[in-house]
Amino acid sequence: CVNDFNNNRFNIILKSRQLGLSTLVAAYSVWQSIFYKEKNILIIATKLAVAQNFIRKVKTYIKSMPNWLLVPTVVANNKQQVEFSNGSQIKAVPTSDDAGRSEALSLLIVDEAAFVRNFDDLWMGLYPTLSTGGRAIILSTPNGVGGQYHELYTKAERKENKFNPIKLLWDVHPERGDDWFEKETKNMSKKQISQELLCDFASSGDTFLTQDTLDKLRILTKSPIEKSGPEMNVWYWEHPLRS
């Protein structure tokens, strides 16, 4: 993931639970702040407790660094923000209508974006704050189809936007195999398995159709043999009989 963060300005991650992504992103934020001047990094979380926990991870990394490596010193810190002597800062806030809107951001991180309240409106307000070259890392487990996060990720997979899609299933963890999966899923519903482990949009939300039904429909669905018309919106599954 770190190479993706460095090589792509916009990254969107669809992930399984408990892979350590939030911890990795916290470490990446510290690296950006220490080795580059005047970095303005904003993390948006689903609630205040999650935002404060992110800053605790940031502070843990800072405390574990040797003094010779921590060249810029910490000049201010509280439960939601850390500021460095080189002008960089890391701030974590809960979701709100005006979160980050008045700032020019170097890096925007949205944690569990599929569960962020009013993420559609929030993203519309935040995107302009990255116009001066800022980067974005949006990460989440799935939460059904139709929301802004789902749209951004699926468009990224189709290369219809600027995001680099990253999909991390449960088995990317080096200590998780089939035995772990079988044990972990014994007391989970199909929806929980789809959401927490399989990164399945369709089965993770409160959808009318089950995944089994969708799979059957996919098998029965046939692609048209020909398309025509000004906008290619006339589809043929069989050619008409000629008299």
Regions found by a protein language model. Name each.
Residues C1-S243:
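Phosphate/NTP-binding elements of NTP-utilizing enzymes
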